[in-house]
């Protein structure tokens, strides 16, 4: 146990900290390599109590899970993991699917449609053009170009008919003359016919295509690459890149030997390659009497706790020569690259189905029938191969990963005691790429091969269901800690023990997500029906940290309230641009339900300088979360608690809160958070106004229930912070100035009322709510008005018509409808936009394709809207 004293660097002389640190927190907080000591009471196989370790580095390993086979293709041996950069060669055997489904070849799309296999592969480059008619009564035509490349994998989805244009030429002796001068169409009649098509999903382009039956070309139920792989010997990486798992292989020649192999692959053995897995491990060296014992800890399993040198924990300088000395010894006796390429047995003491806390929220073993698991594997293999082919260069078999600083204050790994919360979701989407497999302590999204790529983002915005095992005192301490750092965007649910809080540095280092090919509308439709976003978030960090780039506030996917049109609900739900921070998915963790002292609010206001110049993460994230209160709020929840919830202001539909009176009121809004404390209002009002200022999207659809005291306080607060309705001219100047400096929308309809007036004249600006939609929409005004009144041109107080601002992204749904009327669009188009709940943020993202194909607008209407978005305004 005692290192050799002759080395002059004895580990016994080091003073160790009394605070034990989990390994995942250690590697993300301190730079490696580091010396550590196993904490007392930790039981780790292969380690003794108080063992010294050199924590060498973090590595990202990509391995192929394989089963040993016997002659009859029965699984007989242990499950093993073969690194993707394993140097041995394999030869493909006859596959199980070749026996069940012999290889078929086709010479046209029509032959494919008759057989209708699950998938086909393109055996040659195919180009096909067809002239498609726009409609039965429309003379417009469009040339549809179809291009398929050799090796394209097509999943068959169904059949359909399209209208194609066919020309009937009149017999005339002038045809030759007209043909020479290019005017043959002048004496031709345009006809239409129906052409049967095969709808397929092209996995190379990630788009759906319609292949006419007339299209000729060679297709096969096996990939041409896989057919070419039948001959010769290949590396395991070559096999997984060019074939569809699972595949059966044999070892044709003696494989190379690795001193760290725990499973020996021998000549003549047969294996079934099942799937690909990527995991992050921490490689360590146990230091015993100048003897090095290498070992590793996967970060998706339970990790032990270690004690660190006390000087390191306190942030003081300490002799790093000790680390360099032991690192030199390790490098002499230990080859980490060889160690990373070793073949190992898969541990059987934990179930693969329980790796992800998101899959069933299992706390123990979750047994799934083998037939179901195999069927799921079969269905998702195309996704595995797609990810391997598209991101083939990212198949890291032995790449070092720098996790230092990955736990920033923006909501990523929280230092949970592992005996309290064994299953905890990650808060940083960037860590999903550092940990492609779900880790029960640090990563919450599974990236293992059982899940298709779409499903990685399926539960992005859903509240996590974690076991509530903490005591009440712990919860109170968490709330206090969270409240003290909320202005700095910290979301650590538990106080950091000891002095570790000072050592957790904020950093934006995160691996960029892989590029995602664009998807066609048909595939998006399928994803919409699955309630999964078709395109994952492009940014690993949900919030921009640069002050020059305003964060985009996007709307989460609606779970229960869908638009009548499935095509349009995709846009209004924000699925095409979703970026949900996980820190807000759990209202019990992110939403304060107790009043904080006013000095905390003041601290927030001072730190932010202006609630709009430098918005906090809370100001944005409160718009991104779908509050769990609406899906199951307790009726005993008081109205004051309801008022204090900072995420109660919406521009999208929400569910009716049970047990609350139908009384509507305007939401008070503060334009300068610093002056808010000057007014003699109650702490409840101040807190509520501060929380609403974090959600300045629209007060048109705001609080549904308040009591009279809160309403009166809000009116007083509103009169001190918001200009009254007459006159409106100063209001416009203020908005113009604010819009130039603020990345967040400042147009607040709830602040435009005269706070001292309760006459029905105020109903002119109110949003109309259909009777059938009462449970979805909640108007914030005390009265409801007919559609023709609320959609009428808004008066500014001096009789002039309402004019849209230069920046349209901050408009509410109501103001978008007024903008459309401002440019002269018809009422049916305006009501259509209202029905689809298009606000300014969605309006500026609309394209000509969306407006014409999905919204079914005419070319003139599309042109008007696009020019309006680009800055055009009609002259008055």
Curated annotation (Swiss-Prot):
Question: Among the record's GO biological process terms, what is one?
Answer: positive regulation of ERK1 and ERK2 cascade
Region CABIT: what ranges? 12-320
Spell out the family assignment given in the record's similarity comment: Belongs to the GAREM family.
List, as start-end ranges, the regions of compositional bias called Polar residues.
Answer: 558-572, 631-640, 648-658
Q: What is the lineage of its organism?
A: Eukaryota, Metazoa, Chordata, Craniata, Vertebrata
Give any GO molecular function from the UniProt entry.
proline-rich region binding
**Where are the annotated segments for Necessary for interaction with GRB2?**
498-550
Listed PANTHER family: GRB2-ASSOCIATED AND REGULATOR OF MAPK PROTEIN 1, GRB2-ASSOCIATED AND REGULATOR OF MAPK PROTEIN FAMILY MEMBER
Which ranges of the sequence are coiled-coil? none
Name the chain's protein: GRB2-associated and regulator of MAPK protein 1
